[in-house]
Structures are given as structure tokens and as C-alpha cells.
Amino acid sequence: MQLNIEEKSSVKKVLHIEIPKEDVAKELDTAYNELKKTATVKGFRKGKIPRKILETRFSKDVHADLVPHLVQNAFSEALDEHKFNLVGGPQVDPPELTPGEALSFDISIEVMPELEAVDFKGIELKKTMYEATDQEVDAQIQMIRKTMATKEKVTEERPVKVEDFVLIDYQGFVDGAPCDAAPKVENYVMAIGSNTLPAEFSEKLLGAIPVKEMDIDVVYADDDKDEALAGKTVIYKVTLKEIQEQILPPVDDTLVENLGQYKNLDELKAAILDNLKKGYEQRTQHELSEQIFTDLLEKIEFEVPDTMVDAELQGIIAEAEQAYAQNNIKLEDVGLSQDFLKTQYRGVAEKQARRHILLGKIIDQENLELTEDELEAGYAEMALGMNASVDAVKNFFKMDGRQLEYYKHTQLEKKAVRLIIEQGSVTEVAPEVETEVSESAADVEDKTDQ
């Protein structure tokens, strides 16, 4: 076999391969000899069919079976000789086999970039020392109260206020005729100021006293996501039927009992505080990681295989589709598409691929391995997050070896990041003043469903 390697880039190569005609002839002889043992042709005894007859009848099938075999053997030989660190699979256009001639073809491959040793020691890092406060705990409890609030009809005669809910009927009309894209809706409960209906609804309803009928004009933009309404002026005939107030439950042990997970208010507060602390720990780790890769990627330049970027993109798109699917929504329903997301997030995907390459280099460079204790701790953490047993997690990985190897590699990447932080120059700093609190109420409420 003759092999010439064309270097398209540091990560792209084309293997120009030629299998001598003598080797092709031997493989054809073997193929026809095997075929001769089983082939049946009218007028000839099995095993006695002449080669010419076999070629006339079966050459297309023989060539179709033999070419992939020859290509695979040649590719395997090239890999054995040159030890390419492949990324993804090879790309090859199946060549056409002609008896008496050599078989020539090209195989395109992508390989991991070869990096010099990564100097990661002494990176200057700022570690923000976040601290969960009682005020944040109280804010989370207020959020829980809102999720458990009830609505009651306002019996006194008064105008609609900002924090009210309203019970309305409405129907859209265009040029005096009912609009199919804005059909009649009855007994709809809307929060004043919400975006579930056009903003004009809240503006017009605010200050109104039920029962009251009114017209609300809404001018839809030409590029509105609802094509049936885009560019139209719709007059909604609205009936304000009643005002409803949100009634928040008191902060006491009864509130906690209704959550169904905690024994008393103190236990709930402790759980919220614990979630806040965990959230801050994750935030700190994320910020340190961002600083690490900003530093390393500025100092180390290398090409990234398209295959890796495409794989990261597919992961991003799959996550987006899954997130929308949880609400029975497709990408197309919100004006998105896979092609749009591929364009929008390609830079993010390339950045993620670069991180994996750098961490992979550091893992090899430092001979990092997972200890049994680290692996067991990882299983326990995953089991806790899945609300499952450790044995269930282990059994899952036993059934899928590829998932286990992927999991181990992600744990090794985390270990590499911890090593970089340990050997970095870390300065502790106070957090900047923020108006928003960390999200942990959702975590607490998730437990109530378990």
C-alpha cells in the first residue's frame, strides 16, 4: 500500500491511498473462490462455475462487498503506522474497483491538535467570598408564599390596582369582523402588568371598576411572531367582570406543613440557607473556571476540529429543545430553528471545545486519575441529584459503558480545574453589591415534589 499524507491544517489531514493492482487481484481471487463454493447458476454444478460466468453474474455484488473491506484494512494499516489521535470518523467517497488496476482513494480525517505542555501554575485568580444572608432567606420564603397564594374576589367597589388580578372576557375584531387569530375567550384571569396578553390590556384595565365593557386597540408589528396578527390593528372588545386579590399565606409552621417536606419553619429556613450556600459555591467555582480559561486561551492558540465544535453544538441544541419540550413547545413555535441556533451558538460551542482540549492535555500531562473514593463520592452526588440510590446509579453505568467513560472524563476535568485553582495565586475579594438574590427557592420546592 502506498500512503501520502496531505496536511490541510494542524487538525485536518487527507490520506491519499493506493492499493497495488496485485493486492487487488489477490483479494478478488479470494472473493470469487469463496463465492464459487455457494453460488448457483443454472446449467452448472455448485463449485464448478467458471470464473468468467461468476464475474458476469456477480461482479457488481463482489465489488460492493470488497471495496469497503479494502478501504477499512488500508485505513487500519495507516492508523497502526502513524498513530493518529482521531476526532470523529473518517470521511471517504467509496472508490470504483476496476479489475487489473490499482485501487486509489482519499480519506479525510480530523485529529486532536498537538499542544505543548500547558503552564497553568500561578494563574492569578480572584475568588469572590459570597455569604448567604437572612435577608436572602426571607426573600426566598416570600417567593414560596407567592407560589402558594390563593386568589379571592374583591367585593368592594374599587378600581383595578397594579398588584391585582382581573377576570375578563375578550374577543378580537379587525375592520369590524371577528378575527380568527384572536377568538373569543371567557373567564380569563390575568395579572395586571403580566405579558400574557398585550401591554395595552394592563394599561386600559388599570383604574377601571367592574363590571365594565371597553375596547382595547392593539397594533401588532409587521414582524410579530404571530404571523396571523402581524401588521394588523386588532380591536379587542373586553368585559371586566371582577377584580381578584392575591392572598399570601402567613409565614408559620402551617405554611411549612403544606410544603410537605419540612417539619417546621426553622427546618425550612435551614434548607434554604443550605441551598443558597451551595449556589454560591457553584457560582464561585464557575467564576474561577471562567478566569482560568480566559487566561489560558489568551496564551495558548490552537485549531479546533470542526467535529468537536459540531458535537458541542448538537449538545446545545438538544438542551434547548429539551427545555422547550418540557412546556410542550417546539423551537419553531418561538421563531427558532436548528440552523439559527447553530449560527448563534457556534462561538460558544468552539469555546467549549477548546476548554475540553486544554483540560484533556492537562489530564494527560499531570497523569490525573480518579481514585475509588472520588468515584464513589461522584456516584453519591449524582444519586442525590437524581433522588435515586447509589446502586441505581452504578447499575445505570454498568448497562452503558460509554456513559461511564464520559462520566469519568467529566470528573477528571473537574479534578484538573481544582488542581489549577490549588496551584494558582488566589486572592479573596468581597462581592459587589447586588439587588438580586440567588435562586434557591426553586430548589427547595423541588424537594417537596420528591
Curated annotation (Swiss-Prot):
Q: Which GO terms describe its molecular function?
A: peptidyl-prolyl cis-trans isomerase activity; protein folding chaperone; ribosome binding
Catalytic activity entry: [protein]-peptidylproline (omega=180) = [protein]-peptidylproline (omega=0)
Indicate the enzyme's highest-level EC class.
isomerase
Q: Mainly localized where?
A: cytoplasm
Disulfide bond among keywords = no
Cellular component GO terms, alphabetical: cytoplasm
Domain of life of the organism in this record?
Bacteria
Entry-linked Pfam families: Trigger_C, Trigger_N
Question: Where is region (Disordered) located?
Answer: 431-450
Where along the chain is composition biased (Acidic residues)? 431-443
State the similarity comment.
Belongs to the FKBP-type PPIase family. Tig subfamily.
Describe the task this protein carries out: Involved in protein export. Acts as a chaperone by maintaining the newly synthesized protein in an open conformation. Functions as a peptidyl-prolyl cis-trans isomerase.
Protein's UniProt name? Trigger factor
Q: Which organism is it from?
A: Desulforapulum autotrophicum (strain ATCC 43914 / DSM 3382 / VKM B-1955 / HRM2) (Desulfobacterium autotrophicum)
